[in-house]
C-alpha cells in the first residue's frame, strides 16, 4: 500500500543549510554573511540527511546542489532504505546508509569522509510509518504492538511490556511521555497482562485510556504513552545526543546544522545543545588577552522557524514542528570534543536499560 508523505518545513530546512543570509527568530545578529563560501558549499559540498524517510528533504536539497556535491542519507527503516536506494540509482551524488544517525561519524569515516558542509535531521515519525497499521505507531489503527524504526532488529514494544516491572514502565512513561498518570497506566498494563498479553495497538490504547482520568483537549489519552514507548524502544534521545555531538564535530567552519523536532523533549535537547555551543568558553580572568584573542563560540545560532498558517492548513502534522538551525564557527573544539555541549538524556536512560 502506498502512503502519502508531506515533508514538514521543506524549504526553510534546505534554506537553513544553503542560504548565506538565513536567519529565523532568535538568530545571532552579528553573524557575517559569506556568500562566496555558501556558493562553494552548494556546488561541491558534502551533506548528510540523517533521517531520509521518503526523501522529501533530500530531493529538495539535491535540486539545489551542484553536480559535484554529495549527499549521504541515513535511515533505520528498511522501507525508507528501499526508496533511498531507488533515488541513488537515479542520482550518483547519493550514498545510502542503512542505519541511524547516531552512527554518523563511523559510517562517514568508513566512506572516507571526515568533514561535512551540512546536516539535517527530521526527528518526526513519517506519515507512512504512522499510517501503516502494521508498524504499530498509531493508537487509532489496529496493528501489532511493534513501534521499531528498524523492523529487522531489537525487541518490540509488546516484547518489552510483557516483562517490564511496574516501576520500569512508570519511569519510561513519565520520563519520555511526561504523562502525569504514568503510575496508573503502568499498573493498568500490569493488571491486563496478568490475564492476557497485550498484542495490538488498540488493546494498549484501550488499556491506557482506562487509566488516564482526565483528557487533554484535542489529545487522545494514549498519546503520551505511545510517544514514551516509541522513544524508549528506539533509544531516540540517546541517539539524538550522539548525533548532535557528531554533527558539531564533523561540520566545517561555515557548515550548517538544521534539526526539526516535534515534541518538547527533543526540542529542549536541541535548543540546549545549540545554546551551550553558542556560548564562548570562559577566559581566565587574569590572563591578558586582546579582543581578537578572546574565546569564541563553537556555533552561531540561526534561530528557529515554525510552520506558517498555510502549511498547517495543508499538513496538520506540521503544527508542532520546530526547526532550529546553527552554523559552525572556526573556533577549535575543546579537547573533550562536543559531548559537553549536549544535555544529559533525561530519566530512564540515565538509570540504564535493565531489560
Swiss-Prot record:
Q: Where is the signal peptide?
A: none
Q: What is its EC number?
A: 2.1.1.199
Asked whether the UniProt record includes S-adenosyl-L-methionine among its keywords, one would answer yes
Q: Where is this region: Disordered?
A: 327-355
Q: Cross-referenced SUPFAM superfamilies, in alphabetical order?
A: Putative methyltransferase TM0872, insert domain, S-adenosyl-L-methionine-dependent methyltransferases
Tell me which GO cellular component terms the UniProt record holds. Answer: cytoplasm
> For S-adenosyl-L-methionine, which residues are the binding ones?
55-57, 75, 122, 129
What does the record give under GO molecular function? rRNA (cytosine-N4-)-methyltransferase activity
- UniProt xrefs under InterPro entries: RsmH, SAM-dep_MeTrfase_MraW_recog, SAM-dependent_MTases_sf
Recorded hits in HAMAP family, A to Z, give:
16SrRNA_methyltr_H
Instruction: Provide the protein name.
Output: Ribosomal RNA small subunit methyltransferase H
What is the organism field in this record? Bordetella avium (strain 197N)
